[in-house]
């Protein structure tokens, strides 16, 4: 399971 939240800083 790959969990990631794309965030733009």
Swiss-Prot record:
Expressed by the venom gland. It is found in: Secreted. It comes from the Eukaryota. Keywords: Secreted. One of its GO terms (cellular component) is extracellular region. This is Venom peptide 4.
């Amino acid at each position: 399971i790959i969990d990631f939240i794309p965030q733009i800083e």
